[in-house]
């Protein structure tokens, strides 16, 4: 458990949307990410002390299709722009958690482009899970590969390849050293080989013992991922659902049951964890659109 997370009040921003970026990659670089600096007084007014930023790495479309792990998306600005934002946030006492998408990359990822060009002769063929030149795929590449949930624009990485692991760890080290980020939210954590998380945890602990690792987990036993050997925390989707549905149905047993099951003094199964509790995010509807009665908003935020 990282001590700072016990009192962390998070604000979540999806930068590509927040900054009004174009839908697709642009060659021209625009310093939109600096807009976050303007919001620092607003964050301080709400006593926010941790900012979770959705994808900032270079991508072709929505950010979860990474094309370069070591470069800020042109639509957001330059690495220097983002460093300026990070410095301002830290000066204001706000920690920074970035979205780390390590299960898959986009089709414009540099190593995958090399495979598309050189095919079997590419030195990066083993970087991608179950790459097979004996079959075609819906994109008509003349080969196939594993994806995230059947989306062929999201190419699954081979995290059992040491070269891939080293590349990712070195990329993470760059963001830790140059931008002093405080943690990572790990996308699609339930799809990732647990051995990678063990390596990641060891690497981060040695690099910065205060660095926080939080995984996106929707179903299952959270202890499977959040434990001393792997991640520090996971998303608490169980209580997220209970927070709004208990109010909508005027039946508070659901949230009471979840809280007691998770954190109750007599055997709460997650009582030793600090889970990432939330009322909405980029994958679900906004809370104000989910609750049936506007007056319940204040109650839900208070319970959070």
Predicted feature descriptions by range:
Residues 3-9, 14-49, 56-173, 178, ...:
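Substrate-binding/active-site clefts of carbohydrate-active enzymes
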Residues 9-12, 51-53, 96-98, 184, ...:
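Hydrophobic faces of well-ordered beta-strands that scaffold small-molecule active sites
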Residues 16, 56, 101-103, 189-191, ...:
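Active-site beta-loop-alpha junctions enriched in small/polar residues
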Residues 35, 77-81, 192-196, 293-297:
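Short, glycine/acidic-rich beta->alpha junctions
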Residues 92, 116, 177, 187-271:
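Active-site-proximal helices and loops of the catalytic beta/alpha 8
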Residues 102-104, 153, 167-194, 272-281:
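Active-site groove signature of glycoside hydrolases
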Residues 263-304:
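Active-site-proximal substrate-binding groove within the catalytic cores of carbohydrate-active enzymes
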């Amino acid at each position: 458990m990282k001590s700072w997370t016990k009192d962390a009040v998070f604000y979540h921003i999806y930068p590509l949307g927040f900054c009004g970026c174009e839908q697709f990659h642009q060659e021209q670089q625009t310093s939109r990410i600096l807009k976050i600096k303007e919001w620092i007084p607003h964050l301080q007014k709400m006593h926010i002390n941790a900012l979770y930023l959705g994808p900032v790495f270079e991508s072709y479309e929505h950010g979860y299709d990474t094309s370069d792990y070591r470069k800020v998306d042109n639509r957001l600005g330059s690495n220097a722009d983002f460093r300026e934002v990070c410095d301002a946030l830290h000066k204001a006492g706000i920690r920074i958690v970035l979205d780390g998408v390590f299960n898959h990359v986009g089709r414009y990822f540099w190593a995958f482009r090399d495979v598309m060009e050189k095919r079997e002769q590419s030195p990066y063929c083993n970087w991608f899970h179950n790459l097979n030149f004996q079959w075609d795929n819906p994109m008509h590449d003349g080969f196939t590969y594993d994806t995230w949930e059947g989306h062929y624009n999201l190419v699954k990485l081979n995290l059992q390849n040491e070269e891939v692991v080293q590349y990712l760890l070195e990329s993470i080290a760059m963001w830790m050293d140059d931008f002093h980020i405080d943690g990572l939210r790990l996308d699609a954590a339930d799809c990732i080989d647990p051995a990678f998380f063990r390596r990641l945890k060891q690497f981060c602990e040695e690099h910065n013992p205060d660095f926080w690792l939080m995984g996106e987990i929707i179903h299952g036993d959270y202890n499977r991922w959040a434990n001393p050997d792997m991640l520090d925390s996971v998303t608490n989707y169980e209580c997220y659902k209970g927070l709004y549905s208990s109010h909508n149905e005027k039946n508070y047993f659901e949230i009471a049951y979840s809280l007691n099951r998770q954190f109750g003094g007599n055997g709460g199964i997650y009582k030793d964890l600090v889970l990432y509790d939330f009322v909405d995010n980029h994958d679900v509807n906004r809370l104000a659109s989910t609750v049936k009665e506007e007056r319940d908003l204040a109650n839900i935020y208070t319970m959070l």
